[in-house]
């Protein structure tokens, strides 16, 4: 399946890390949920959690046998973005490369539109 028409991308690095974390939890029903909440130094912030359920209206994106889930309200702020994973000097983390963000905080955890 091509991701050309998907509103949000799920990178290979993020999918590989999710796959590893799911294996550690020994629960193949887990999916990575990304969501937006109010807060942070720029107005909105990203959240990531593992979830077993997919709610009505949720968008799902699959990569390498794992699923990313986004609720409809959060998706409107994430269209065109990429959920990715990085490991560096500041530690390892999931993050969103979001073209809709007009400003972001220094760590990239919060943004405004």
Curated annotation (Swiss-Prot):
InterPro entries given in the database record: FeS_biogenesis, FeS_cluster_insertion, FeS_cluster_insertion_CS, FeS_cluster_insertion_RrpA, HesB-like_dom_sf
Cofactor(s) required for function per UniProt: iron-sulfur cluster
Sorted UniProt keywords: Iron, Iron-sulfur, Metal-binding
GO biological process assignments: iron-sulfur cluster assembly
Domain of life of the native organism: Bacteria
GO molecular function: 2 iron, 2 sulfur cluster binding; 4 iron, 4 sulfur cluster binding; iron ion binding
GO cellular component: cytosol
Presence of the UniProt keyword Chloroplast in the record: no
Binding site for iron-sulfur cluster: 41, 105, 107
Entry note: cofactor: Binds 1 iron-sulfur cluster per subunit.
SUPFAM superfamilies registered for this protein in UniProt: HesB-like domain
Alphabetized NCBIfam families for the sequence: iron-sulfur cluster assembly accessory protein (TIGR00049), PRK13623.1 (NF010147)
Complex formation: Homodimer.
Similarity comment: family membership: Belongs to the HesB/IscA family.
PANTHER family associated with the record: IRON-SULFUR CLUSTER ASSEMBLY 2 HOMOLOG, MITOCHONDRIAL
Protein function: Required for insertion of 4Fe-4S clusters for at least IspG.
Protein name in UniProt: Iron-sulfur cluster insertion protein ErpA
Biological classification of the source: Bacteria, Pseudomonadati, Pseudomonadota, Gammaproteobacteria, Vibrionales
